[in-house]
Every structure is written in structure tokens, then in C-alpha cells.
Amino acid sequence: MADLKVGSTTGGSVIWHQGNFPLNPAGDDVLYKSFKIYSEYNKPQAADNDLVSKANGGTYLNRVIFNRGIQVPGAGNGLTGMFVGPGDGATYDNVNLDIISWYGIGFKSSQGTGPRTIVFNVRDGEISARGNINSQRQVRAEAAAPIAANDLTRKDYVDGAINTVTANANSRVLRSGDTMTGNLTAPNFFSQNPASQPSHVPRFDQIVIKDSVQDFGYY
């Protein structure tokens, strides 16, 4: 039987033994010195390597970059999540980030169990809000005319309506009295009171028709 000593070799390589390769069992684990050896049976856990667990979750303490996007499951069909846009811009054709939903996107406060306060219908672009919408600049509408009673109205539509009202007002005579800037023509004018001032238009019973014969009776 060979006499193994410190530094014994075989084929030029040092022979491993408990002295130079200390493996110690510890329950279901095997330790090299004081370090755990991972195996197919004893796989490393997320916490052992500062990883976020797929099953148990975790917290990233610094910025995380996703080159493609983030997809989350949601009700309905189709893709839901945040994804890189086609380019640098702020138009319908070109944006930096796309937030995609099958139908709607909602916003709600984490305080209590209150309802959603803002809802985006991403199918037709409708936005619903429970509170006021305050803007430091203009709110513009592309629709030429309002449809519903509570629709916002464009300035050009209001200006056109005002001009129509003004035109109608300027072309009409007020029942309460008015002053004409031009001629007033009508088939007949009826006066309930006889003329009493030089500027009044006399009634028929106050005038003598030219070339007519008047019977003033007997005196």
C-alpha cells in the first residue's frame, strides 16, 4: 500500500486529500472549507447572488435599463406594457415611448380604495377625468362645431354665431323702438295714434288727398 505524504503526486499532479482539499458535509450541503458548494440538488437562490427572484420578486435599488420594453399581463387580448417608440418625436407617427393597452389605461391614487380618477381610452383617444383639467396654455379643438350640449366650442364658431346675430340685429326693427339708417318700406303702415308733432307721420284721417272733393257739410 502506498504511503501518502504531504505533496504526494500521481502522474505529476498533487493527490487531493482531506488535508489539501477539505470537503465537509453539513446536512444536505457540502462545504469546501466554509463555503457552500452548489449543485443540481442545491441550487443557488436569488438572495445568494444579489438577484431578483422570478417567483418571489424583489427590489432593484438602482436604475434598470430595458432595451426592448416591459410587458405585463392584462384583461382582454393583445400586448400590454411599455415599449420603446419608433424614434425621437411627439407626433402620432413618431414618439420615444409607447404605453400599450388592449382597451383602457387608468390612473388612481394609492391612498385608500378610491376609484380611478383619469381613464384613457386608447382605442379612440378619449380621456375621462373626475376632476378639473387646468392648463397654463390653450386647449384647442379640431372639431369645427360642437355636437353635444357640453362640448367645448371653438372661437371661430362663436365668432361666426356672433356675427350672424349681429347681422340679424342690424337688419331688424326693434319692437321697443328703433332708428332707421336707411329707407323703411312696407305695403302699409298702421298708426294707432294720430300725428301730434311736426315730425310724426300723419294718419289717413288727418290728411286731404290731392284732387279729391271734400264735403265739409253745412255751416
UniProtKB/Swiss-Prot annotation:
The keyword Transmembrane does not apply. Keywords: Host-virus interaction, Viral attachment to host cell, Viral tail fiber protein, Viral tail protein, Virion, Virus entry into host cell. The keyword Nucleotide-binding does not apply. One of its GO terms (biological process) is symbiont entry into host cell. This is Tail fiber protein p36. One of its GO terms (cellular component) is virus tail, fiber. It is found in: Virion. The distal half-fiber contains two molecules each of Gp36 and Gp37 and one molecule of Gp35. Signal peptide: none annotated. Structural component of the distal-half tail fiber. Disulfide bonds: none annotated. It comes from the Viruses.
